Amino acid sequence: MSFSYDQARQFGKTYVGALNTGTEAFAALFAPGAEVSVAGDPSDPQGVRDVTPAGRSGFRGARLDPPHVVLTVRVIDPASQSVDDRPHRLTFDASGRITRLEA
C-alpha cells in the first residue's frame, strides 16, 4: 500500500495511540507473520512496546521513504528529564496492515 503524507501522519497518530493503549490494540495493526526488529534484532510487537513505553511515547512526525513510511516516535524519560526521538520504519500490505517494522 502506498501512503500520501497526510495518510502517513494520520497512521502515525493511530500507531502511537495504539502503542500507548495496550498490547491488543498495537498488535491489531500488524498483518499475520509481520517481520519485526528492534535495534536490528528480531522481535515482535511487544518488543517494540517494551522499548517505547506506554504513557511515555508520543507521535513526533512522519516522512515517506517509498516503499516505507518512517514515523518518529518521541520517548520521554522523566527520570533523566530527557527525550529520545526514535525512527520506526514500516512497510504495509494492501489492506494497510504492517508487514515489516524496524524500530
Model regions and ranges:
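C-terminal and inter-domain tail/linker signature
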Residues: 1-103
